């Protein structure tokens, strides 16, 4: 768990790292309270103080500062049209070719450095030449292979791109950062084949137009701008062929190649975390399930003045094609230039949403990529995207988890240890070294909720402090953590990371204490949980 959390506390862009579409529209005249609840859940936090409420003057300045025109969506300059290898054999051939190429690259690099005048690159360079395996030539081989095969392998690469460079080697982090920014897109004939297989030969009757070149290309699919016959602008996500059938082999092939470099820390992908990752990837390949998740979130946040969820276009919804309203705004990593008050407000809303997802809805979108959160300055709203990794949490888990967070917020180390055992995070038979490291990790991550007054996310060294504990946590763990925590901690770490990136000051303790009291009040009697969602093997329920 803390291995994943410690590595995630670093900048990330996300799989759709481009501006998308048009402004969402203003909320209308008059004063507004910018809260994710629009009701009693956290109403008192919108009144005053850093990270709480904005006055009319703040909102006026934000609207005056908005761009005159929302930028048109566009692909990365590095993206190119390239056929997706759809069969397992063709995908394996790409990984085999990569392994051979990397080996030859190592020999060439070692030969070059053994010649007179050959030496490791200085500190001022790119840093890639400091490892023969991760030379510039080999880096290019890895980038090209992952951008060609796409799918689960590229998804893992994008996940590793957000690791702290003290967590994996800086050279490898640099490679995966390039991977994140330059996914390729499939050629027209391959895209049309998927559309015909999913929507039928008459698919064009469902739309007035569909741009042939996508405006975003990600690990699992690419997104095209379209227009319905009623004039509604839509984003149509089309899945690459063969991706869903190659998840397990892709992950194993990529990790086998990377282990050649010894660049990944031992234990980074334990068996249990690999199983959880593969399950999440299978969910993300089921666009019908994603449509149901998006509809669920749209209903849960229907009255929310700050967050919006685009509507699903059900006539463009199949297992490998998903149509939704075209959304507008810029990813969170492009919001650093906003005023401190606006950055505080955005991050306050993100943290509030995380707490609501876990402890009110018990249903969370677990992908923390910044491109899944588009901020529109014209309306002071954030649009939520990409619901493929959404999942539910049972009350037994949340009952224990909220007590672990409460113990950390209260600074009670003994209680953290006991509640972690109640959560089945620990067995009770761990070594003292492991127990101490676990408690310390919980206390570090609980600091925002333990701090009186606004917590300065921009001043911490959370990633480095967690990193120092990882060797002990890997060496002495007796049992895998609860399955729910893999995705949950990735999302929470991503939210903390966004707050750090935007240098937010937020009164987190008051926010959590209110959440805690409302959670237990809602459990007497039991509050209804979010509706059941289709999982692998379940029948599809129309999201409408």
Swiss-Prot record:
Known pathway: Cofactor biosynthesis; ubiquinone biosynthesis
Motif (KxGQ motif): 155-158
InterPro entries named in the record: ABC1_dom, ADCK3_dom, Atypical_kinase_ADCK, Kinase-like_dom_sf
Record-given protein name: Atypical kinase COQ8B, mitochondrial
Disulfide bonds: none
Record-annotated active site: 367
The family this protein is said to belong to: Belongs to the protein kinase superfamily. ADCK protein kinase family.
Family annotation (CDD domains): ABC1_ADCK3
Gene Ontology molecular function: ATP binding; ATP hydrolysis activity; lipid binding; protein kinase activity
Domain Protein kinase, chain residue ranges per copy: 191-423
PANTHER family per the UniProt record, alphabetical: ATYPICAL KINASE COQ8B, MITOCHONDRIAL (PTHR43851:SF4), PTHR43851
Basic and acidic residues composition-biased segments: 54-67, 75-84
Primary location recorded for the protein, binned into one broad class: mitochondrion
Gene transcribed to yield this protein: COQ8B
Tissue-by-tissue expression: Widely expressed, including renal podocytes.
E.C. number(s) listed in UniProt: 2.7.-.-
